[in-house]
Amino acid sequence: MYAVIKTGGKQYTVKEGDVLKIEMLPENVGNEIKFSEVLMLVDGDKVTCGTPFVAKATVKAEVLDHGRHKKVKIIKFRRRKHHMKQMGHRQYYSQVKITAIGK
């Protein structure tokens, strides 16, 4: 069984036991969270697509860690002016483990 969930403006395909890094959530480490925005649920040959979400379907997960991704470097040039601007960005994330997928 697997599901497609929406969180942080992105979509993720998840199965029980998966560990993934998603956009930062305001939850403490060890807390259990529920994702109610389930877009699709697949159980063997039975496929349930939501319009836009599957009714009464939830995915439960446990928050394992919070952190920051690797730095993304941004460089802006102005041609022929000997001008260069360097910047960097590190996005915050929450690492979660999928514990249950249910309807």
Swiss-Prot record:
Keywords for the protein's UniProt record, in alphabetical order: Ribonucleoprotein, Ribosomal protein, RNA-binding, rRNA-binding
NCBIfam families: L21
Source species, domain of life: Bacteria
One GO cellular component, as annotated: ribonucleoprotein complex
Assembly description: Part of the 50S ribosomal subunit. Contacts protein L20.
Keyword Ribonucleoprotein: yes
SUPFAM superfamilies: L21p-like
Family note: Belongs to the bacterial ribosomal protein bL21 family.
GO biological process: translation
Physiological role: This protein binds to 23S rRNA in the presence of protein L20.
Listed GO MF terms: rRNA binding; structural constituent of ribosome
Disulfide-linked positions: none
Pfam families in alphabetical order: Ribosomal_L21p
UniProt-recorded name of the protein: Large ribosomal subunit protein bL21
UniProt xrefs under InterPro entries: bL21-like (IPR028909), bL21-like_sf (IPR036164), Ribosomal_bL21 (IPR001787), Ribosomal_bL21_CS (IPR018258)
